Swiss-Prot record:
Membrane topology: Peripheral membrane protein
Record-stated family: Belongs to the COQ4 family.
Role this protein plays: Lyase that catalyzes the C1-decarboxylation of 4-hydroxy-3-methoxy-5-(all-trans-polyprenyl)benzoic acid into 2-methoxy-6-(all-trans-polyprenyl)phenol during ubiquinone biosynthesis.
Xref: InterPro entries: Coq4 (IPR007715), Coq4_euk (IPR027540)
More info: This protein may be expected to contain an N-terminal transit peptide but none has been predicted.
Cofactor(s) the protein needs: Zn(2+)
Name by which UniProt lists this protein: Ubiquinone biosynthesis protein COQ4 homolog, mitochondrial
Nucleotide-binding among keywords: no
The organism of origin for this protein: Drosophila ananassae (Fruit fly)
Residue positions binding Zn(2+): 169-170, 173, 185
Major site of localization recorded for this protein: mitochondrion
Length: 266
C-alpha cells in the first residue's frame, strides 16, 4: 500500500505540473504532460512547500492545538492537510470510478456566494434540496465563504478534493438534517469519517464528543452516535455527488438515493 501511494504522489504530480522535457526525463517521467486546469495552476502558485519532517511537526502541533481549542479552525484545517493524503488518494479512486465523480474532477466546481445563484435556490419548492440548503444557511447563520484555503498538500488534485470536502460540509449538514451546534457537528463528523476515511474527521468526532456537557453526552450516546454510525456505514460515497446539479431534486428522494435517514427529534 505504501509503494502505491508513493508512486501516485510522485509520478502524476510531475506530469500535472507540465515539466519541461529535460526536467521530465531527469525525473524519469514521460515529457507528455497532462495540461493543468485553472484550479491546479493557481494552487501550485499559492501552495506552501513543506518537508516530510515539517509535515510531521505541523501534524502533531495542529492536533494538540485543535484538541486544546476546537475553535481553532486554522489548526483543524492544517491537521486535515498533513494527515489526509492516504484518505484523499482513496477518495480520488472513488471519484474516478463514477461518471458523476469524473465530471466533478474535470470541472472542479466551487461553492461560494459568487458561484451559487441563491435567488434561484430561494425560488425552488420548499421540499427541494436547494431550498433546504438555503434554509440551513439562514437558520444556522453560516456562509459558504468561510472555508479556509488548502495550502500544504503536494498534489493539486488532492488539494481540490480537500477543498471540495470543506466546501461541501454544509451540504452534508443539510442532507443529514443536522444543525451546527456541538451535537450536530460531532454527529456529522462521524458520518464524514466513516464515509471518507479522513483522519481529521475521526479526530473531530472523538475529541468533539469529549467536550460535550453531561446532558448532551447522554443524548449523544443514546441517539446521535448510533444514528451517525449507522448512516456513516450505510450511506453511499458522498464526495462523488455533484450537489450543484441536485438543487431541484426533492430532498427526500436524494436522501433515499444516498441511503441516508434523518434522526427523529429527541
Amino acid at each position: 500500500m505504501m509503494q502505491r501511494c508513493v508512486w501516485r504522489l510522485q509520478m502524476p504530480l510531475a506530469l500535472r505540473r507540465g515539466l519541461a522535457s529535460g526536467e521530465a526525463k531527469n525525473q524519469g517521467v514521460s515529457p507528455e504532460a497532462e495540461p493543468l486546469d485553472s484550479f491546479e495552476r493557481q494552487y501550485l502558485k499559492d501552495r506552501i512547500e513543506i518537508s516530510p519532517f515539517q509535515r510531521v511537526i505541523l501534524g502533531a502541533g495542529s492536533s494538540i492545538a485543535a484538541l486544546l481549542d476546537p475553535r481553532r479552525h486554522d489548526m483543524i484545517a492544517c491537521l486535515g492537510e498533513t494527515t489526509g493524503e492516504g484518505a484523499l488518494e482513496n477518495i480520488l479512486d472513488t471519484m474516478q470510478a463514477s461518471e458523476e465523480g469524473q465530471r466533478i474532477m474535470a470541472e472542479k466546481p466551487r461553492i461560494h456566494t459568487s458561484t451559487i445563484d441563491f435567488k434561484l435556490l430561494e425560488s425552488l419548492p420548499a421540499d427541494s434540496f436547494g431550498a433546504a440548503y438555503v434554509k440551513f444557511l439562514k437558520d444556522n447563520q453560516v456562509t459558504p465563504d468561510s472555508r479556509m484555503a488548502v495550502r500544504f498538500l503536494e498534489d493539486p488534485k488532492l488539494a481540490y478534493l480537500m477543498t471540495r470536502y470543506r466546501e461541501c460540509h454544509d451540504l452534508i449538514h443539510t442532507v443529514l438534517g443536522m444543525p451546527t451546534n456541538m451535537l450536530g457537528e460531532v454527529a456529522v463528523k462521524w458520518v464524514e469519517a466513516l464515509n471518507t476515511g479522513l483522519p481529521m474527521c475521526y479526530g473531530g468526532a472523538v475529541f468533539g464528543a469529549v467536550r460535550l456537557r453531561p446532558k448532551q453526552r447522554r443524548a449523544y450516546l443514546k441517539h446521535y452516535l448510533p444514528w451517525a454510525l449507522e448512516n456513516g456505514k450505510r450511506s453511499k460515497p458522498l464526495m462523488p455527488v455533484y450537489w450543484e446539479k441536485r438543487w431541484e431534486q426533492k430532498l427526500q428522494d436524494l436522501r433515499a438515493e444516498l441511503g441516508i435517514t434523518v434522526l427523529n427529534k429527541v
